[in-house]
């Protein structure tokens, strides 16, 4: 996407197909913001969501610009695996990076309007109503301790002298004069872990030098106008202003981003089986093609998995059984256990720069 404005100020409202971004878009119109509307297309949304985006665009009376990425499926094929809970690269590659690329092409001061609410998750409860978009390029989004793993190992009741911790133990002895057989070892490690030289700051880094140069001339701020709203307030606001939310909510889905998400609940899987069985079949084929499973190990109880492997626990040295569930296994389990009835809560992506919904 090339430059779309050279005006001094440029408001952007992110539209995902979900209720919160829809309410934010309506709020912008009612408050005379007149933003450019952007939809980051992962090419993994449901057809109902794509239809919703098209209809919402007509109702808004303003174009919704589609930002394209490599797409979820092509990204997974390229990496030869699906995203996972520990390697959740999907949001960054499919939404955050295309958005940053787009921002850096603009010659304007930008204000981004995000549909994020405090009650959605613990992570979002800590967000501010107004912020700087590139904040976590210049201050850490989290700080960890160099010896966190040793402390966790001790807290779990295991001896810290594991292969994973060997280098850390040597560092403790050399730099901090702490040995594993010292009295009050845990207390000493905890104190050492809080020393400035043992604190590790984590920053976002994608195109950092380009961002630094861009920020010499322009700014990029974030506004979250509905951050304090409840879910009822969101739906009521949409309907009271003459709009209808994404039809997937009527079908029982609570989140309507990637369809399905690798972090979706078993209730959500049941809904996909019911409404989009062809998507389930497609994922089965992708699993075979990539020799990778869509869901993580132990997503369902091990005894229900067709593939079970032995894994040596790094902390105890003991071997344990870990189930690797195929989509076929998950479907059988979900149907056998009666998932999908009643309300359920979706999972939440944690990226600070761009919400999944």
Question: Which residues make up each language-model segment?
Answer:
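Nucleotide-activated chemistry modules centered on ATP-dependent adenylation/adenylyltransferase
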Residues: 1-357
